[in-house]
A protein has these predicted regions:
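Amphipathic, interaction-prone secondary-structure segments
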Residues: 72-102
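Short coil-to-beta transition motif at edge beta-strands of beta-rich domains
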Residues: 2-18, 24
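Intrinsically disordered, low-complexity, charged/polar segments
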Residues: 46-74, 118-142
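Short beta-strand-centered aromatic/proline hotspots
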Residues: 19-37
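SH3/SH3-like beta-barrel fold
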Residues: 35-45
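Short intrinsically disordered terminal tails
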Residues: 1-2, 140-146
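Short linear proline/tyrosine/threonine-rich motifs used for host-factor recruitment
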Residues: 39, 49-51, 85
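Intrinsically disordered, low-complexity regulatory segments enriched in Ser/Thr/Pro
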Residues: 90-125
Length: 146
C-alpha cells in the first residue's frame, strides 16, 4: 500500500497485483478524501490507458541497481559500493542498504568530490518516487524512468 500524502503528480508507482503486460503507472491526479489515484497505466507493448484505483491497490515502484544503471548511474572506479549520478553542480551517491535489496541511502557530495567524508548522508529511500522527490528538491531537471 502506498502513502497517498507522499505522492505528487508525475510520480511513478505500480499495482500491488500486477497482470500480464502491465509495467508501471504515472500519477495524473489525487483525491486524498476518497483515497483514489487517477493514473496512466503503461504496458510492455507501448500501450497506455487511463485508470482510477484506490491507494490500497497501489504500491511504490521499487528502486534497483539495474534501474539506476539504466538511468545513467554508475559505480565508482575505486571499488566502493556506491552508485553515483553526476549532475552540475552536485554529485549524488546511492549506497545500497545492508538490510534490503531495494533500499538505498542517498549521499549528497559537493562539486565533483566522491569522498564519503565530504558527503551529507540522508535517510534510506526505497522507491522511484522518493528518489524523484529528492532530485526535484535539489532542482535537478532529471526524470527517473523504469
Amino acid at each position: 500500500m502506498i502513502n497517498i500524502i507522499e505522492l505528487r503528480i508525475g510520480d511513478i508507482i505500480t499495482k500491488e497485483n500486477k497482470y500480464e503486460g502491465y509495467k508501471y503507472s504515472i500519477v495524473e491526479g489525487l483525491d486524498s478524501l476518497s483515497g483514489k489515484i487517477r493514473h496512466k497505466e503503461v504496458y510492455e507493448g507501448r500501450g497506455r490507458q487511463m485508470a482510477i484505483s484506490s491507494f490500497v491497490d497501489m504500491s511504490p515502484y521499487p528502486l534497483s541497481v539495474e534501474l539506476l544503471k539504466a538511468n545513467g548511474w554508475q559505480y565508482s572506479l575505486d571499488g566502493e559500493n556506491v552508485l553515483f549520478g553526476e549532475f552540475k553542480p552536485i554529485t549524488i551517491g546511492l549506497i545500497p542498504s545492508a538490510e534490503f535489496d531495494y533500499a538505498f541511502n542517498p549521499i549528497l557530495l559537493p562539486g565533483c568530490s566522491k569522498r564519503k567524508r565530504d558527503a551529507i548522508f540522508m535517510y534510506e529511500i526505497e522507491s522511484v518516487h522518493e528518489l524523484q522527490a529528492l532530485l526535484d528538491m535539489w532542482r535537478l531537471n532529471v526524470k527517473i524512468k523504469p
